[in-house]
Regions:
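Aromatic "clamp/platform" in nucleotide-sugar-dependent glycosyltransferases that forms part
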Residues: 287
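Nucleotide-activated donor-binding/catalytic signature segment of Leloir-type glycosyltransferases, i.e.
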Residues: 243-270
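Short His-centered aromatic/hydrophobic patch
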Residues: 87-92, 111
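Glycosyltransferase donor-sugar binding loop
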Residues: 43-45, 176, 229-248, 261
Length: 386
């Protein structure tokens, strides 16, 4: 079987959970399942994938979404040799949809997020958000199968697109590379970025987007125990408005307490692993999260997780067993921030409890989110469609 896998992100250009998912799915399909996988991605050339330019020179000032659609058309023209197409995120969904119609082959879409659940994307894409929403809807309604990365995501798919037959939606969770993500005893990276190894710290790793809830974390940080350090490994903000808001909150937090460390450049995975390994807790204050691979990464490093109880997070983080969950309501964000701080302070007061949560987290991550078994489920789905 030859799989045509369509994606925007592909190593080394991986910046989110969907890219991590694609990376490990392709590895396991090729190396474990022995399948032929033709990867079509966007951006610079890669040795093991066909790369398509993200910019169309015919309209250099056009909305970013138009450039994506132009790339999708080029992708669709080159996937006729596949037996099945599998697209990831709206960036590649149209390529899969057009390719399936053009070449008469089945199309599987993986739902890593849903545009109707992310209205703040309009702030970033402008009118392009209406295009991305149209692309996703069109591809999902026509797809032969939809893979949801959590049960929560499956429910969201059926709510957003009730025309989809429930039998076409299949839950296959994201996985974790437990061989790579493990507790790192070294502290050289931790110390090099300014963390005091003699004081506890909590860590956030992720993009600064509306989805990730960083402003909530920063406001909650005003109530954290004064001895705990706050470490943010956070990339650039999605929009100038969000950057200004985040910068103001960081400045206010740094003015109120010491030990607030912000690392804006992307660190190597090995460095992130070490920071996760020595944290008292990993913080995930997302307001929307279909699964949250980074929670699995923290758990595999034996670190407790304090996270919002949204989307697929409760399927990963067992409340009171591998971490602590905080209810989130968009109508009462002040309460969320207060309870987030309370859960962090609970672990500061009882580091032994935090250690037990972290140890149980690795057991759960390894036992339930193994990539080999999840890739096998994906292969079984492919075969059922041929």
């Amino acid at each position: 079987m030859r799989v045509g896998l369509l994606t925007r992100e592909y190593p080394p250009a991986v910046y989110g959970g969907a890219g991590v998912h694609v990376d490990f799915l392709v590895r396991h399909l090729r190396e474990v399942a022995g399948m032929e996988v033709d990867v079509s991605c966007m951006g610079a050339e890669r040795p093991d994938a066909r790369a398509f330019a993200e910019q169309d020179s015919r309209f250099p000032d056009g909305n970013a979404a138009l450039h994506v659609l132009s790339t999708d058309v080029a992708m669709a023209a080159h996937c006729g040799s596949a037996d099945i197409l599998h697209s990831h995120t709206w960036y590649a969904n149209l390529a899969g949809h057009l390719g399936a119609m053009l070449h008469d082959i089945p199309h599987v879409v993986s739902a890593h997020s849903l545009e109707p659940q992310r209205p703040w994307k309009a702030e970033q894409l402008g009118g392009g958000y209406r295009l991305s929403s149209w692309v996703e809807r069109t591809a999902f309604l026509a797809a032969d199968a939809v893979i949801a990365v959590s049960r929560g995501m499956a429910a969201d798919v059926l709510t957003a697109y009730p025309q989809i037959d429930e039998e076409r939606v299949h839950v296959i969770h994201n996985g974790i590379d437990a061989h790579f993500y493990h507790r790192d005893p070294r502290t050289d990276v931790v110390e090099s970025i300014g963390i005091d190894p003699l004081r506890p710290y909590v860590a956030f790793v992720g993009r600064i987007t509306r989805q990730k809830g960083v402003p909530h974390l920063l406001r909650a940080g005003q109530r954290f125990d004064p001895d705990v350090q706050i470490v943010l490994l956070a990339g650039a903000a999605d929009t100038p408005e969000l950057k200004a808001e985040t910068d103001d909150l960081i400045a206010a937090l740094q003015g109120a307490r010491d030990g607030v460390i912000v690392v804006s450049e992307m660190l190597p995975r090995e460095s992130v692993r070490q920071v996760l390994s020595h944290a008292l807790a990993f913080l995930c204050p997302s307001v929307y999260e279909p699964l949250g691979i980074v929670n699995l990464e923290a758990m595999a490093c034996e670190t407790a997780v304090v996270a919002s109880a949204v989307g697929g997070i409760p399927e990963v983080v067992a409340d009171g067993e591998t971490g602590l969950l905080v209810p989130y309501s968009p109508g009462d964000t002040a309460r969320f921030e207060s309870e987030l701080a309370a859960r962090v302070n609970e672990l500061v007061r009882d580091p032994g409890f935090a250690r037990r949560l972290g140890e149980a987290g690795r057991v759960r991550a390894v036992a339930r989110f193994d990539w080999a078994s999840l890739a096998s489920e994906t292969v079984d789905l492919y075969r059922s469609l041929l």
